[in-house]
Structures are given as structure tokens and as C-alpha cells.
Amino acid sequence: MKCSVLPRSRLSWTMCVLLLPLLMLMLEGGVQGCFIRNCPRGGKRAVDSVQPTRQCMSCGPEGVGQCVGPSICCGLAIGCLMGTSEAEVCQKENESSAPCAVSGRHCGMDNTGNCVADGICCVEDACSFNSLCR
């Protein structure tokens, strides 16, 4: 009887060891969606119903651009600066719980982006070339 119990306990221990990393990966993926400090009220899906109440921060040389993402600064005179020292100030937008309004004509898929520079359309975390933004 002891022989039949021993393989079972080793099997369950082995399964636990194998499932633990899988569980940790699943939890990590779920947590990366939004941090507590910058999640909108009502969760990530409530973003569409929340109207931005303030203008996004100024950035770039002499403050001529606007923050359009965590490390993206764009303006008509400067184009888009991504991951540069001028765009570092845009990280501070994550500290605010209130969303900001990016100025510029709507563009992109389902008009979810804004024209932020000549020929450039940006959504929350990425920018692309768009002929509507000329």
C-alpha cells in the first residue's frame, strides 16, 4: 500500500512544480494590463466612457510639443520624439489618474488616434504615418 501512495505524492509534487511557473506567467500577464496608479475608474474598458478633462503635458524643446504616450512627444514643429530625453517628461502622465486630451484631428482605425505632427497619427502608445494628417 505504501508503494502506491509514494508514486502518487511524487506525481502531485511534480505537477505542482510544473504548474507554479505557468501560474506565475498567467498572473504576470494579467497584472501588466494597467497599474493601480493609472487605471481609469471602472477598469480598462471604461476608458471610452471617460472624457479627458485636461490638456496633455507640454514637452520637447521649449515646450512646443505635447505628450501623446508614456515616452512619445510630438508637435508640428518638431515631429515626434520617441524615447528621447525631451520625451522623458511624458512619463509623468502615468502618475495622474485623470486622462488627458491630445489635441489634433482624429485619425487611425475607428478614429481612435490624433494627428499630432505632419503626416503622423498617434494612438495611446504608438504612432504611424497617416495621409489624413497632412
UniProtKB/Swiss-Prot annotation:
Subcellular location(s) of the protein: Secreted
Positions annotated as propeptide: 44-50
Protein name: Terepressin/terephysin
Domain remark text: The cysteine framework of the terepressin is C-C.
SMART domains: NH
Entry-linked Pfam families: Hormone_5
Annotated signal sequence range: 1-33
Expression by tissue: Expressed by the venom duct.
Keywords: Cleavage on pair of basic residues, Disulfide bond, Secreted, Signal
Cellular component, GO, one term: extracellular space
Listed Gene3D superfamilies: Neurohypophysial hormone domain (2.60.9.10)
Similarity comment: family membership: Belongs to the vasopressin/oxytocin family.
InterPro entries, per database record: Neurhyp_horm (IPR000981), Neurhyp_horm_dom_sf (IPR036387), Neurohypophysial_hormone_CS (IPR022423)
SS bond partners: 34-39, 56-100, 59-73, 67-90, 74-80, 107-121, 115-133, 122-127
Organism whose genome encodes this protein: Terebra subulata
Domain of life: Eukaryota
Coiled-coil ranges (or none): none
A molecular function (GO) term: neurohypophyseal hormone activity
